[in-house]
């Protein structure tokens, strides 16, 4: 069953906005509560792939297949490997982008990371899809808007980054050393109380967000330690993620529409469900390989882990599994909408506002910051 109406496409995209805007908040929550990102991402990857299988075997098999739109299982046996490779390439870059952004969240925050990655995705992804979709929209309207969007966000980020760093430095410098010792000495009891990640909370949960006490408690508890590290690390990760995100939609576009005519004569284009299946396979494989590697060879001074430790780490697993489902269903919905309305619209329909909302509401980003930071 394919979405063909504009109304159905819009509904898919709006639902995708919520799903894709929510799952990063769950990963951020777990990292801030001390769960290793490798463990979280492995759980997330499993249900993300499960969502793709569920979509393929349900929506991909509904209705009677047509010669130019075969059902999912029928299409698996066809000679469509050029399109399959495009779909799998899209899955690889999406997996790399998601992995980079997971670490960037710790350095520059959920809201800032998503604004920057979304702006890069809009500019590059929309430009590529504009040419792939045979220039169906007016370039003189499309490109000045997305270009100005990127410039404004980049300049705003640079100003915010400098101002926010100054805010945090001022908060910590005004925090007396005696008070630090008292706060840190009480941390062990706080950690015991927060062992249950679904219900537990430490003192950092009860301290007002944005204060020096909050920053110190959060740093002590979180998995990725950021004190003493440059925010340029987060900036580099953010831009890497944005470049990866900007490529997966054009790759998926090529997989489903074959604009470069790589398929043999008589072979139908991949349906969105078949393409998403192959897309998710490569996304899953890359995620598993990299995160198992990171268990034994961690990055950013994270502690070493193992498969045995991962399997035993059930704290917060339900949230990581939920994040994978939200991402998997969200991606399928945005691709279904993009197939009907055009992948330019799908690239423009970004979900950073939802993520920005969660960053401010759940994690207190920008709380008790200076007027300069709020203006940025």
Curated annotation (Swiss-Prot):
Positions in the Cytoplasmic compartment: 31-41, 102-103, 159-231, 296-317
Binding-site residues for ATP, renumbered to this chain: 223-230
Family to which this protein belongs: Belongs to the plant ureide permease (TC 2.A.7.19) family.
A Gene Ontology molecular function term of the record: ATP binding
Disulfide bonds listed in the record: none
Spans through the membrane: 10-30, 42-62, 81-101, 104-124, 138-158, 232-252, 275-295, 318-338
InterPro entries: UPS_plant, Ureide_permease
Organism, as annotated: Vigna unguiculata
The UniProt record lists the keyword Transport: yes
Signal peptide: none
Subcellular location: Membrane
Biological role: Transports a wide spectrum of oxo derivatives of heterocyclic nitrogen compounds.
Positions on the Extracellular side per record topology: 1-9, 63-80, 125-137, 253-274, 339-376
Descriptive protein name: Probable ureide permease A3
GO cellular component assignments: membrane
